[in-house]
């Protein structure tokens, strides 16, 4: 009987060890959390959100910062309403915190200079980038806008952006629709940007 109990105890211990090993990869695979559709700025029609995809969106991933966010260790979710309002969140985990700081700087410079660059690339287009301040959350989040008008086809578009960081994790959020800056929900977007960083971990 003692031998049987010893054997059962050994088997149970081995099973617990295997369970611990099996749990380890799950813990290591923890990923940053994304915004939900309801956490985007309020719109006249409900927001919907895609599932979270691996990598970055097509065509370089981010308006005003194409190919700036590496596809490796990145994931994204897209948002849309029944009208023309849309958005995206791209989150990447950098190798080191120093790399994350560099990425934030790169994205901020790209957003700040986006209007001038678009005007150079598209003669006749009027584009203005503006900075809307820093949000106090984790290591910070910074908000920008891009207001564009194309007289040739008579349309105007407004986009809001945020770049936030929590340790090695950087998250980029964009909101956009037809219209001008006066039509944009800047205050509500700041809340969205803060939530995006708070939800990461």
Residue ranges of each PLM-predicted region?
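Surface-exposed amphipathic alpha-helical segments
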Residues: 176-201
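Short, surface-exposed beta-strand/loop micro-motifs that present aromatic residues
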Residues: 75-80, 158-165
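Short, surface-exposed coil-to-beta transition loops
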Residues: 86-88, 153-160
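N-terminal "mature-domain start" segment
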Residues: 26-76, 191
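A short acidic-to-branched-hydrophobic micro-motif
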Residues: 76-108
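Short, well-ordered beta-strand elements
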Residues: 87-92, 168-177
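Secretory targeting and sorting signals
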Residues: 1-28
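Short Gly/Thr-rich strand-loop-strand
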Residues: 46-60, 109-156, 199
């Amino acid at each position: 009987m003692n031998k049987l109990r010893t054997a059962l105890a050994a088997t149970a211990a081995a099973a617990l060890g295997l369970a611990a090993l099996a749990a380890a990869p799950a813990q290591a695979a923890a990923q940053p959390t994304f915004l939900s559709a309801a956490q985007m700025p309020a719109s006249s029609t409900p927001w919907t959100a895609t599932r979270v995809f691996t990598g970055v969106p097509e065509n370089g991933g981010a308006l005003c910062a194409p190919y700036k966010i590496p596809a490796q260790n990145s994931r994204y979710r897209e948002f849309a309403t029944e009208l023309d309002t849309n958005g995206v969140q791209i989150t990447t985990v950098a190798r080191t915190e120093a790399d994350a700081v560099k990425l934030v700087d790169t994205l901020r410079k790209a957003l700040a200079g986006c209007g001038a660059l678009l005007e150079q690339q598209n003669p006749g287009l009027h584009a203005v980038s503006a900075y809307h301040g820093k949000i106090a959350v984790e290591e910070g989040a910074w908000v920008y806008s891009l207001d564009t008008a194309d007289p040739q086809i008579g349309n105007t578009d407004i986009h809001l952006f945020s770049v936030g960081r929590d340790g090695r994790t950087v998250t980029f959020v964009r909101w956009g629709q037809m219209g001008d800056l006066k039509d944009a929900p800047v205050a509500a977007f700041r809340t969205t940007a803060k939530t995006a960083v708070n939800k990461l971990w």
